[in-house]
Regions:
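...with weaker cross-activation on analogous glycine-rich loops/strands in unrelated enzymes
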Residues: 78-153
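Tryptophan-centric aromatic hotspots in well-structured domains and transmembrane helices
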Residues: 63-66, 70, 123, 239, ...
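Short, polar loop/linker segments at the starts of domains and inter-domain junctions
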Residues: 22-47, 156-164, 210-227
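A generic structural motif
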Residues: 73, 121-122, 135, 244-246
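N-terminal capping segments
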Residues: 1-75
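Beta-loop motif signature
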Residues: 191-246
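Short capping motifs at secondary-structure boundaries
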Residues: 17, 72-81, 235-238
Length: 247
């Protein structure tokens, strides 16, 4: 299952991408080639190619929000990505103000950040102007990866690149944070704490997997972990392994 960690890793891999001066697919997938300021990107192309993701074609338009949407679709798949973004098919989600409203409608808009949030910025008139992905936060700063921006500490709403940035939490340009409704598994948390069990491998016609024992050498629990089940190995002693299993 994809997680916030995967989402952030994908975003970090895209840092340095430059928008293109033409829509020529020969260059869309090269980070640096054919750079220009006409807002053509692989992100908009791929979402446009889905046919009904947005209410119209978006390549050639401002793409900060398109970049965030692309990250979610690429990481979690289209269906789950749209659920996390609170966006229907043929949505207006390429617009920053509309994306904010999608979160607000679900009660998912907050004043303090968490990893995996979508950050929203406003201009001096209070209008939404820019957005990005939160990849970390501490007591002083929020750290972001943004599309259609440039380096530096100020908010750049149409800068032409994917950049890693940071802002003080008190920055008045920050309007708020949209928080996708991640499952515990998607946050990377264990669904339940590890239950410590003892196991050994038994081969033969009756078992093809790991038989669970509560103590080393004790009677089995009539539970079987099928081959391929992932466990956390804490200790190995002879033929016994002490493992944690998410149950």
């Amino acid at each position: 299952m994809a997680t916030i960690k995967d989402l952030i890793q994908l975003a970090q891999n895209e840092v340095g991408y430059l928008e293109k001066k033409t829509a020529d697919t020969k260059y869309l997938y090269d980070k640096k080639a054919n750079a220009g300021y006409n807002n053509y990107t692989k992100y908009a192309k791929e979402l446009d190619d889905l046919g009904d993701f947005y209410n119209g074609k978006k390549n050639g338009y401002h793409w900060c929000d398109v970049f965030v949407d692309w990250l979610f679709v690429k990481t979690f798949g289209r269906k789950r990505g749209q659920e996390l973004l609170n966006q229907p098919n043929k949505s207006t989600g390429a617009g920053v103000g509309f994306s904010k409203k999608f979160y607000q409608a679900e009660g998912r808009y907050y004043s303090s950040p968490e990893k995996g949030d979508q950050i929203f910025f406003r201009n001096s008139s209070g209008q939404m102007q820019h957005t990005g992905l939160v990849y970390d936060t501490d007591k002083t700063y929020v750290y972001t990866i943004e599309g259609n921006t440039s380096g530096g500490s100020s908010v750049i709403a149409n800068g032409g690149a994917v950049c890693s940035k940071k802002y003080k939490l008190t920055n008045t340009s920050i309007d708020g944070y949209g928080r996708p409704k991640y499952t515990k598994a998607e946050t990377g948390e264990n669904v339940n704490p590890d239950k410590v069990l003892y196991t050994r491998y038994v081969s033969g016609v009756d078992y093809e997997g790991l038989v669970i024992h509560n103590t080393p050498g004790g009677p089995d629990t009539d539970k079987l972990l099928q081959v391929g089940t992932k466990v956390n190995v804490y200790q190995i002693s002879g033929s016994w392994s002490r493992v944690g299993i998410n149950q």
